Regions:
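Flexible, acidic/Gly-rich N-terminal and inter-domain linker regions that tether
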Residues: 2-91
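Short, surface-exposed basic-aromatic patches at helix termini and helix-loop junctions that form
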Residues: 182-189, 267-271
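Conserved, mostly hydrophobic/aromatic
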Residues: 83, 96, 135, 192, ...
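Local cysteine-cluster metal-coordination motifs and their immediate loop/turn environment
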Residues: 90-102
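Short, acidic/polar
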Residues: 114-121, 176-181, 258-267
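Core AdoMet radical
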Residues: 102-117, 125-150, 156-177, 184-235, ...
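Conserved C-terminal portion of the radical SAM core fold
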Residues: 194, 198, 213-289, 302-311
Length: 311
């Protein structure tokens, strides 16, 4: 999926139409939060609505057709579809050099409550502006606190509002097995971003992070999917667990990894049967004041494209 098809929902014509027509009917504070958090979410390209089907059920809301794309994309019959791509909050306890939402940046900040985000999703979905939700978040307090709030959003959508649209949740690195497993009961896809392929380079740009906190939730997701497949062979009505599998994202060009290094890691990830897609995101110079980062005039989009071709 190219960068053009991964535009954030906040830049869409549907969003602008919604803003102009319904802003007088909605809480202005919520709409202001929506604008900030949709903008903050745009740097994450690792979302896709392909790979799952949720058929409408009696008394339920909507349905998802497998094979459709991310944010703004097109179905095989030519129809344009959208996901609401948003963050729960862009506050973060981490100070990662490559991230626009890093703790030390002086940027507009916002946090949506669980009920506000659920209501927004349902409102947009009822008006046919979106096919589903791509939800990520900055980390506040600790990984489990943040992950629990993400799970509550998905759980309320599924159980309270009978939402049958697509849900992609970003699992928080360092989150507990219990919360990851609960998320898998309500999300179509879970993803944990590796971000920087080599741990020594991750430590250089994000000293508070490590690869263990990323790979551990990946293992939880894989184990949950494989166990669920076996259970469904024995028991017909076992609920599906992350039916669209998992994905991850790596930043390209922020550190010294070669294409060979990146593709070697991707190849090892694809050895796991639950890894559906590795996304590559050309580094965007958002924090030019940080001398640990390369001085790039523009993202390495050709390199990004070549990695997708090789992948």
């Amino acid at each position: 999926m190219n960068r053009e098809n991964a535009k954030p929902f906040a830049h869409s014509k549907h969003y602008l139409y919604f803003w102009q027509k319904y802003s007088d009917q909605m809480n202005e504070n919520v709409l202001a939060k929506l604008k900030i958090l949709a903008e903050s979410a745009k740097y994450d390209v690792s979302c896709s609505s392909s790979g799952t089907v949720r058929r409408n059920q009696s008394g339920a809301l909507g349905n998802t057709v497998g094979g459709w794309g991310i944010c703004h994309s097109f179905a095989e019959d030519g129809r344009c579809i959208s996901l609401l791509k948003i963050m729960l909050t862009n506050y973060c306890i981490y100070d990662c050099a490559y991230c626009i939402n890093r703790r030390s940046n002086d940027i507009p900040r916002a946090t949506l409550s669980v009920s506000e985000l659920v209501d927004l999703t349902i409102e947009f979905y009822r008006r046919n502006y979106i096919e589903g939700l791509f939800l990520s978040s900055g980390v506040v307090r600790n990984p489990d606190y943040t992950m629990e709030r993400l799970v509550r959003v998905a759980k309320d959508l599924r159980l309270v509002h009978k939402f049958n649209g697509y849900i992609h949740l970003k699992s928080i690195p360092g989150a507990s097995r219990e919360l990851v497993n609960e998320a898998g009961l309500y999300a179509d896809r879970l993803s944990v971003n590796i971000e920087i392929p080599k741990e020594e380079n991750l430590k250089l740009l994000a000293p508070e992070k490590d690869h263990k906190s990323v790979y551990q939730p990946m293992r939880y997701i894989q184990q949950g999917i494989l166990t669920n497949k076996e259970d469904r062979k024995k028991f017909r009505h076992v609920p599906r667990f992350v039916p669209a599998g998992q994905s991850t994202q790596m930043i390209v060009g922020a550190t010294t990894e070669s294409d060979k290094d990146i593709l070697y890691l991707s190849s090892s990830l694809y050895q796991h049967p639950t890894m559906r897609r590795v996304y590559y995101s050309g580094y965007i110079s958002v924090n030019t004041y940080d001398k640990r980062l390369p001085a790039l005039k523009q993202p390495p989009l050709v390199r990004e494209n070549r990695l997708y071709q090789a992948d």
